[in-house]
Amino acid sequence: MKKIFDTTFTIKEVVATGIGAALFVVIGMVSIPTPVPNTSIQLQYAVQALFGVVFGPIVGFLTGFIGHALKDSIQYGNPWWTWVLASGLFGLVVGLLKNYLRVAQGVFESRDIITFNVAQFVANALVWVVIAPLGDILIYNEPSNKVFAQGVVATVANGLTVAVAGTLLLIAYARTQTKSGSLKKD
């Protein structure tokens, strides 16, 4: 049986977390606005998905949590903690795919692409339509119609962004990995 969470945290994973969070911040500074206030199309979730799938759920969580907290602090002066948590949880859920996808073995084919995209759309819906809006209502006393509208737009925008850019990143990453049995003795 495969472990869902490995309790060890390697130097490689610490470095990956730092790089992932830094990329989350830098890429997150470029966003495409939507008609819904405080909601935009953001490419950093594709990178977070890559880091989650390659390095696992803890790196996926920390990449989003730290990256979003820093990005909000730089852009707005302070983090919006419910959405910071949602970003982290997105990375955690997608990171659970590490043991089920075959990117580390150099394989990311139709079955893997479908599994990845179903999981990331479910993760996006969970964090942006359920967790972030409920947190906004309970913690920040935000109007429910506003936060659920933001959540739906974020789910669609992030889901499509990760479906396209995240899939392309994972295909590219898988191609850099050596497939088992691909080396032959001359």
Swiss-Prot record:
InterPro entries on file: ECF_substrate-spec-like, UPF0397
Family per record: Belongs to the UPF0397 family.
NCBIfam families named in the record: PRK13661.1
Localisation per UniProt entry: Cell membrane
Broad class of where this protein is predominantly found: membrane
Membrane topology: Multi-pass membrane protein
This protein's name: UPF0397 protein SGO_0469
Transmembrane segments: 14-34, 50-70, 77-97, 119-139, 152-172
